[in-house]
Amino acid sequence: NFGHPREDTCNIILLDEMNLSRPEQYFAEFLSALEKNNPEERLISLSETSLPNAPAMLTEGRKIRVPANVWFIGTANHDETTNELADKTYDRAHVMTLPKQDKRFTIKPFEPANYSYRSLRKAFGKARAERKEEVVKLLKDLTGDAFTEQLGSQFELGWGNRFEKQALDFIPVMLACGASSGEAVDHLLATRIMRPGKVTGRYNVSAETLRNLKGALEDFWISADLAGDPRKSMELLEADIRRLDGRS
């Protein structure tokens, strides 16, 4: 329903340095609500009981609905003053890592542009429809590959419904934006699977186990005919192999 202009506007709520406290506590209800497929069910309780003289748009006089056109973007630093984000936060978010920039770089100029929420959703839906068969096959190949078997047997990790849903949403849009399927899959693997606490950063696996996983990933890339290399995933694996080997 886009009956009012504000309903067709993309609204972004920016939460800076989210992990100075613990998002799993203060943001938990939002994490749960944002995963609801039905926007009408994305409700946040403001009170245990109905509020007197509550605003008309509150559900049951005590719940506020998070509209589909409201997106949350949070920043998180990783240092001694912050808390580590829990798996459930990472797993429900789209993660972008901003690496340290030691050298100056030139920002590409772009003309300002405005996009309505409706136009974005339409573009996302078009990309998903056009690329669905391709992405479903890719995920099927990944699920049946030796790489996935090693994740399960050596790391006790699997894909799950959430990963599949995110991949079906994310990969087609990346392809429509000009990225390769290799870049899209690499980003998902690096942020979902290879990050510390999942595959890397552990003490109950050996460097040899990581080398075997690295080889399996390379083999999958070739068999699936994915463009480029899984650069982000490889960098994480190689850094952790050096750690376990006692090298800096």
Model-derived regions: residue spans:
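C-terminal regulatory/interaction module of P-loop NTP-utilizing enzymes
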Residues: N1-S248
